[in-house]
C-alpha cells in the first residue's frame, strides 16, 4: 500500500515506537497509584515522555498535559479561555475540533483570512478581527486540507500586543515544524500524538501556559482528600488512568524525530508535495498549492472526490476525500460543494510514492473549468 493519508494519522510507525509500546505493556502497571516496581516503571515512563516533550517544545515538563488526542486538548483549552457568548477570532481554515466547541459555547466567531497561501490577507483580516473586540483567538498552524502554513508567529505577536489570549492548534505541525510554547506566548498549544509526532492513536499533548479548567474530574493520585481537582499542573487536567503504552510510544516517536531531524522530514515531505502538485497540474487537475506549503496537496478531479479516492484505494493508494472535517477551509477555497482529494506525505516520503500515485491519478477524469 502507498499510504498518503498522514494528515489523518501517521502510518508505518518507526520500529522503536512499536517496541516501546510492547515493552510498556509487559513492564508497566498504573502510574502514581503505588510504590511497587511495575507502578514505578509506569511513572518513570510517563515522566520520561513529559521531559522529552518539554525539550521538544521549549517548556517545563509540568506544562505538558497528556490528552487522548488533539481534539481533547483543544476542548480543554477552549473551555478555559472562552466564556459563553464570547467573541473569538479564528482563521479561515479551522477544523471542526475548534469550531464545534466554539459553536457549543455560543461564541461569536470572527473568521479572518480566507485567501489560500496569502499571508498578507491572513494578517490583515486577523488584525481586523482582533481590533473588533475579540476576547480570545484560536488558530491553526497548518491547514489540514490544503497544507497552508499560516503566519502564526506574526499572529501570535498581534495577540500579545493587544492582550488577547490565544490557542494554537498544532495538529498538522507538531513534529513537522518548530513549535515553542514560550516563543509564541500562547496560553495553550494542542497537538495529537499520532500524526507528526509518530506516536499511536489515543495520544495527545496540551502545552499549558496557564492553569486550565478541568474538562473532567476524577482521581489523580494526588491530594486525594480534596473533592476539587488539584490546582497545579499537570494533575489538574489529567483525571483517571493515563494511556501508558501510548505515552511510551509517543516518547519513542519524539526520540526518532530528534534523531532524524524534523527539518529533514519536512523538506522531504515538501519536495514530494511539490512533485505531486506539478504532476497533477500536468494531468489537468485543479490543484491547490502555494508558496507557504507543508507536505499536503489537495486537488479536485473530474468526478466525485469520494469516488476518486475509492478508485485509488483499489490501486493500493490511501488518500482522503471529502470535507476533511473542515468546512471553513473549503468555504475559503470555494470547494465546499465538491470537497477535495487530499494527498498528505509523512516521515517516509519518497519518489516512489509520488510516482505510483501519479500513475494511478492519470486514470482519473479531469474536471472541466
Per-region residue spans from a language model:
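Pyridoxal 5′-phosphate
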Residues: 1-369
Amino acid at each position: 500500500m502507498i499510504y498518503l493519508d498522514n494528515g489523518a494519522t501517521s502510518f508505518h510507525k518507526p520500529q522503536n515506537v512499536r517496541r516501546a509500546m510492547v515493552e510498556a505493556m509487559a513492564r508497566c502497571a498504573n502510574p502514581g497509584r503505588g510504590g511497587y516496581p511495575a507502578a514505578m516503571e509506569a511513572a518513570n515512563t510517563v515522566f520520561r515522555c513529559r521531559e522529552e516533550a518539554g525539550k521538544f517544545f521549549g517548556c517545563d515538563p509540568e506544562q505538558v498535559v497528556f490528552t487522548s488526542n488533539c481534539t481533547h486538548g483543544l476542548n480543554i483549552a477552549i473551555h478555559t479561555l472562552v466564556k459563553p457568548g464570547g467573541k473569538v477570532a479564528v482563521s479561515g481554515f479551522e477544523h471542526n475540533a475548534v469550531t464545534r466547541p466554539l459553536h457549543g459555547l455560543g461564541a461569536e466567531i470572527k473568521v479572518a483570512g480566507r485567501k489560500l497561501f496569502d499571508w498578507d490577507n491572513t494578517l490583515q483580516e486577523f488584525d481586523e478581527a482582533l481590533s473588533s473586540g475579540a476576547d480570545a483567538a484560536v488558530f491553526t498552524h497548518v491547514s489540514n486540507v490544503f497544507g497552508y502554513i499560516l503566519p502564526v508567529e506574526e499572529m501570535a505577536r498581534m495577540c500579545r500586543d493587544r492582550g488577547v489570549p490565544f490557542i494554537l492548534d498544532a495538529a498538522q505541525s507538531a513534529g513537522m515544524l518548530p513549535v515553542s510554547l514560550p516563543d509564541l506566548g500562547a496560553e495553550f498549544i494542542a497537538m495529537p500524538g499520532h500524526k507528526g509526532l509518530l506516536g499511536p492513536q489515543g495520544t495527545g499533548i496540551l502545552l499549558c501556559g496557564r492553569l486550565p479548567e478541568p474538562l473532567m474530574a476524577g482521581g489523580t493520585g494526588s491530594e486525594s482528600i480534596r473533592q476539587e481537582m488539584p490546582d497545579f499542573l499537570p494533575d489538574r487536567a489529567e483525571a483517571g488512568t493515563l494511556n501508558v503504552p501510548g505515552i511510551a510510544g509517543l516518547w519513542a516517536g519524539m526520540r526518532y524525530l530528534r534523531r532524524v531531524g524534523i527539518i529533514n522530514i519536512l523538506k522531504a515531505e515538501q519536495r514530494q508535495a511539490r512533485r505531486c502538485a506539478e504532476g497533477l497540474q500536468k494531468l489537468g487537475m485543479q490543484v491547490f498549492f502555494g508558496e507557504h506549503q507543508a507536505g499536503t496537496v489537495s486537488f479536485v478531479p473530474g468526478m466525485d472526490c469520494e469516488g476518486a479516492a475509492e478508485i485509488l484505494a483499489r490501486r493500493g493508494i490511501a488518500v482522503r476525500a471529502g470535507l476533511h472535517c473542515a468546512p471553513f477551509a473549503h468555504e475559503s477555497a470555494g470547494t465546499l460543494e465538491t470537497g477535495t482529494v487530499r494527498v498528505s506525505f509523512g516521515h517516509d516520503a519518497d519518489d516512489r510514492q509520488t510516482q505510483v500515485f501519479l500513475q494511478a491519478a492519470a486514470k482519473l477524469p479531469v474536471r472541466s473549468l
